[in-house]
UniProtKB/Swiss-Prot annotation:
It comes from the Bacteria. Keywords: ATP-binding, Cytoplasm, DNA damage, DNA recombination, DNA repair, DNA-binding, Hydrolase, Nucleotide-binding. Residues 255-338 are annotated as: Head domain (RuvB-H). Its EC number is 3.6.4.-. This is Holliday junction branch migration complex subunit RuvB. Mg(2+) binds at T66. DNA binds at R310, R315. Its main location: cytoplasm. The keyword Nucleotide-binding applies. Belongs to the RuvB family.
Length: 338
């Protein structure tokens, strides 16, 4: 069964997200500094009748990068073309997209860190000079021609900004990191989503759902769907604190927003490896999960909330992790082997 609290996109999220997605910066909740800056830059670009500078959005999955890309296009009054790094396999794929853009259009590339180097090299002159270099012919007779492109805005999104090459990163005029959301912000998002779906939810229920959503709107909205199911079948249709608590108990999501996999990671470090330090590959082998998945999907929330430390020697469970599971914190310094 798929995790209810994975921040990664799932197929069943697509239609639901489209229904709930805000269309304007005014409707967008959270990320105050990013919203303020984007409004300034968009207003300035529209005032000059120019395309917005290229924008790079990075941060953990599920925080609203795709939503912001769509809002940018909406606020600019232009079309958006969406694709992703893995889909653009050849330079010709990118060339076909670029040549079909209209002036000031937004090109959104999700997982932009997964573009191949060959495709990236096509993107450099397109971003900087709005030109496309095309090679005609082969061998000594090959020649390069330049095609002019309309001035467009590239919005790139990534969960791993460190994997972007410097030449690509340096071509973005606006670079913004999305942060995890506060409980109050998520409660507002849940309340707004419930209203759009025609559901009644009280303040306590919204806050409880927010507290268990790992600071991530995508998770909050997904859990809201499950709570809605419970309220419809086993309650009177209204979402209250007790309805939220009982739904999440059935889903095995505890008061910190941990599910079985989170608990497995922390308990593996505590019980099998003495609290750490232990390498990521070793943890992955012990629980049967890819180390990249642990690093990208599970770790950010555990580290952000003080349950896991990342050290040069490996991962270490913190005293908060021991307390959460009712374990005594070791008196010896973490990581001492002898």
């Amino acid at each position: 069964m798929e995790r209810a609290i994975t921040p990664e996109k799932r197929d069943d999220d697509l239609q639901f997200d489209a229904t709930l997605r805000p269309r304007t910066l005014q409707d967008y909740i959270g990320q105050e500094k990013i919203r303020e800056n984007l409004k300034l830059f968009i207003d300035a670009a529209k005032g000059r009748s120019e395309a917005l500078d290229h924008v790079l959005l990075y941060g953990p999955p599920g925080l609203g990068k795709t939503t912001l890309a769509n809002i940018i296009a909406c606020e600019m009054g232009v079309n958006i073309k969406s694709t992703s790094g893995p889909v653009i396999e050849r330079p010709g794929d990118l060339a076909a997209i670029l040549t079909n853009l209209e002036p000031h259009d937004v090109l959104f590339i999700d997982e932009i860190h997964r573009l191949s180097h060959v495709v990236e090299e096509i993107l450099y002159p397109a971003m900087e000079d709005f030109q496309l270099d095309i090679i005609i012919g082969q061998g000594p007779s090959a020649r390069s021609i330049k095609l002019d492109l309309p001035r467009f805005t590239l919005v790139g999104a990534t969960t791993r900004a460190g994997l972007l090459s410097s030449p690509l990163r340096d071509r973005f005029g606006v670079i913004s990191r999305l942060e995890f959301y506060t409980h109050d912000e998520l409660a507002f998002i849940v309340t707004r989503s419930a209203r759009i779906l025609g559901m009644a939810i009280d303040r306590e229920g919204a806050l409880e759902l927010a507290r268990r959503s790992r600071g991530t709107p995508r998770i909050a909205n997904r859990l809201l769907r499950r709570v809605r199911d419970y309220a419809q079948v086993r309650a009177d249709g209204a979402i209250t604190l007790s309805v939220v608590q009982e739904t999440l108990r059935l889903l095995e999501i505890d008061e910190m927003g941990f599910d079985q996999m989170d608990r497995m990671i922390l308990l593996t470090i505590i019980d099998k490896f003495g609290g750490g330090p232990v390498g990521l590959d070793t943890i992955g082998a012990a629980i049967g999960e890819e180390s990249d998945t642990i690093e990208d999907v599970y770790e950010p929330f555990l580290i952000q909330n003080g349950f896991l430390n990342r050290t040069p020697r490996g991962r270490v469970a913190t005293p908060a992790a021991y307390q959460h599971f009712g374990r005594l914190t070791p008196e010896r310094p973490q990581g001492s082997l002898f």
